Amino acid sequence: MSEVISEALKNARKIVIKIGSNTLAKDDGTQNTEFMASFASQCKKLIDQGKQIVVVSSGAQVSGVSTLSEWARKKDVHFRQALCAIGQVELMTQWRKAFSEQGIHIGQLLLTKEDFENDHRSLNIRNTLFTLEDEGVVPIINENDSVSIDEFQIGDNDNLSALTAILWSADLLILFSDVDGIFTDNPKTNKNAKIVEVVENIPELRKSIRIGEKNAFGTGGIETKIQAAEKTTVYGIPILLANGSHENILTNLENGTAKGTLFTVH
């Protein structure tokens, strides 16, 4: 089935790639700058093939903790929002460094739920994405966590990336996390869990798997990834789930040597 995944990536020209917090964090909670550099290099190879890339990057809070470790245990919402404000600067600094080494400029978009619900704002986002891509700039998107409150939150970057893919009319959405894809059970606790390589029917998938809780650093989990697939597949955009921590994951997905779960469209 890796051939199906390989073909999906090869056939896509406009690709949105979401990178989860666990992929961007090392075990000690600091930024995984090695991954960021490798990822930018792999993106350059895709861009050289004529593909366009939009990155949806989590990691503001992780980057904030890396900078101000003494705030790590603070639970107050104002501290968390302030931590994201500090961390977003650090996050973009590292992304700028990673992509500049490949001769690529980046542009930042911090978005909220309101931006997608307002026709004028969403049109401006779409136009900005098209302009950046036409000029060879890679957009890097995150939710504006410092100003978002519960009723105006998208809440997780799986759904943010799905909304972005739909708005930009992407050909493929890739969700990177710390697991290889969707399994019949949690592979970290059940060694007999099997990967689901291709999903053609989401309601049937829900009946056949066990959905666990969100991960340590992120706000999502398997449930939010399925929600994202429910959004994009309606618009003819397949979703690929894969483990971003694997070395050269983008390249290996393209050549068919990496595992993943592909939500297909009909």
Where are these regions (language model features)?
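C-terminal catalytic "cap/lid" subdomain
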Residues: 2-73, 77-105, 109-266
